[in-house]
Regions:
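A short acidic, glycine-rich active-site loop
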Residues: 141-151
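Short amphipathic alpha-helical segment with a characteristic S/N-K-E followed by hydrophobic residues
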Residues: 2-7, 81
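Amphipathic alpha-helical segments used for helix-helix packing
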Residues: 62-84, 132-138
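Alpha-helical DNA-contacting segments of helix-turn-helix folds
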Residues: 7-14, 89
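Hydrophobic alpha-helical bundle segments that form small-molecule/ligand-binding pockets
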Residues: 64, 90-115, 138, 162-173
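Short alpha-helical scaffolding segments that buttress acidic/His motifs in well-ordered protein cores
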Residues: 54, 68-75, 121, 125, ...
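Amphipathic alpha-helical packing segments from all-alpha helical-bundle domains
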Residues: 45, 79-105, 150-154, 158
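Hydrophobic alpha-helical connector segments
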Residues: 9, 17-64, 114-121
Length: 177
């Protein structure tokens, strides 16, 4: 019980909510990668759908979303709870995206360069969530709206596909209209 027990319950709640928010994207990605079976167009579509789902979910969380602030605090100043957050949220996200990097680039999954590239590309998604106040101010936006989220997502998807030398995915997103 006590303060530590309450914090652990809050961490459990945060993990469950985050898994619900982005966990489906990881499962869909894995299924898409299996179905792609070497087809780079299908790999690009699966990758784009994953990035689109994760980034749309993260940017849709307003600044008032307290679990977001809790996760950021744990990243900045890890406590014992960070290990639980890492294992339940970050490791599955990284593992799912690393599969994309390995398949798209034919890199060794155990090579540190593969892990660095994976985290760099995931960082392209997470930076818009993590640095929300900076980016909003830089763009002159008060907040992310659905149209603005769609624009950010389109640009990030395009950049990640390009970095992985995957073909562009046509006919999706805000700029396809």
């Amino acid at each position: 019980g006590g303060k530590e027990g309450l914090y652990n319950e809050v961490i459990d709640y945060t993990i469950a909510g985050t898994q619900k928010l982005i966990g489906g994207a990881e499962d869909t990605l894995r299924a898409g990668l299996d179905a792609a079976a070497g087809d780079r167009d299908a790999l690009a579509r699966a990758t784009a759908a994953f990035v689109r789902a994760v980034l749309t979910a993260l940017l849709g969380l307003g600044p008032e979303h307290w679990p977001r602030r809790l996760i950021m605090r744990e990243i900045d100043t890890p406590t014992a709870a960070f290990d639980r957050l890492y294992q339940a949220i970050f490791q599955p996200l990284i593992d799912a995206f690393k599969q994309v990097v390995v398949i798209a680039t034919d890199r060794d999954p155990d090579n540190p360069e593969t892990t660095i590239l994976t985290n760099a590309l995931l960082g392209e998604c997470l930076i818009f969530h993590r640095n929300r106040p900076i980016i909003l101010r830089d763009l002159g936006w008060h907040e992310y709206t659905p149209d603005r989220i769609a624009l950010v997502v389109d640009i990030v998807v395009e950049g990640i596909l390009d970095a992985l030398d995957l073909p562009a995915v046509k006919g999706e997103g805000a700029r396809a209209k």
